[in-house]
Amino acid sequence: MSRRGLGSVVGGLWCVIVMGVALMNGPISCRNGVTFPTDGSKDLPAERNAMTNTMKPLTPEEERVIVHRGTEPPFSGRFWNHFEPGIYGCRRCGRALYRSENKFDAGCGWPSFDAEVTGAVRRQPDPDGRRTEIVCAGCGAHLGHVFEGERMTPRNVRHCVNSLSLEFVPESALDLRFGRAVFAGGCFWGVDAAFQKVPGVIRTRVGYTGGGTTNPTYPEVCRGTTGHAEAVEVLYDEQVVSYDALARFFFEIHDPTQYHRQGPDIGEQYRSAIFYANETQKAAAERLMEQLRAKGLDVKTDLQPLGPFWLAEAYHQNYYERLGKNPSCVRRVSRFGDRPNDSVP
């Protein structure tokens, strides 16, 4: 069986049977006999935050789940068996919550994920006193519950989420909804790992850009003959983090004064570079570079228009996460002397 054992199948079937009875007769029971109300007895108010003005109108059924902590019947939601590539966001405020690559079939009839977008989901004690509720960190919308120790995936975590609490942005529409930035600062493994921890960063991918070779391979780039740099593509939620904050962070996790190298990694492929997608990004990068020069730094960072971004081989993606280690080559250094409100903490 893929990604889950017989125990999870049996558990999921048990959960569905009890759920069906509960929907007709009262409280719902899900996992280990825990019960929770379906009648809205514990309302969940919207939290005031920067996104309050973007709250979307809800249908009565969505309000029952999102505001009043209700639960949709199993196998009824539109996303329980949905595996199209893309991003799942909060139905109420639109904040990015989950990546499609972290979705799996838990056999329970609700969308299940084994990881969330950094900082996007908040855990809190459920009113039943036993389980852990998960809510959108942006607006407080009820999502569902999180379970650990079920051994369904290597991460050993399952976010059990109501479809009614979610919306979906397909891969083809990501650029219409979210921001995209591309940075190069030496070995892309460490830069990738650093950006993955930034709240508001939805997804990172490592690859090659800035050169002339079509569909380059890692050995070709390492030879220094392609003109490409090892780079990181950052997909980010502009409701949470700004491009300016990401660029500041970039300048603080590598040494922008080194030319065509970072530490022991030497060559054009390890250069410091920002690849801007539009004039707004270009202006932000130029402004930050001037601030650093005003502080006496001899900035060597290349500023180039973004061309084709060639994804690196699969074994380079999420390198340190797959190893279960933290990079030793990346250390943040304060370079700007201030920390504005939209800065990465």
Regions found by a protein language model. Give the residues of each.
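Short polybasic linear motifs
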Residues: 7-9, 13-15
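Flexible coil/turn and secondary-structure edge motifs
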Residues: 30-345
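C-terminal segment of classical bacterial N-terminal signal peptides
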Residues: 20-28
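Generic early N-terminus positional signal peaking at residue ~5-7
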Residues: 5-6, 56
